[in-house]
Amino acid sequence: MAQIRVIHDPIGETLTIYWDDPEREEICEEVGQGIILIKDAQGEIVGFERLYFRPSNPSQDLEVILHMPMR
């Protein structure tokens, strides 16, 4: 089963989300408005990073909802 990794760095004000192995990261492409796409060597997106991320309520927990494809 695939895992999603969510990393929030409150000091660096970044939110990074990987839906594939972070070790596959080879290329980062800034696409605008503080969004960076993280790609593997083949150019497939394995995650993204949001710069200047400040949650509206930092004391709130981050809720992650996974939608699994139906078979």
Q: Model features per residue range: what roles?
A:
Residues M1-R71:
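Small, basic N-terminal interaction modules of short regulatory proteins
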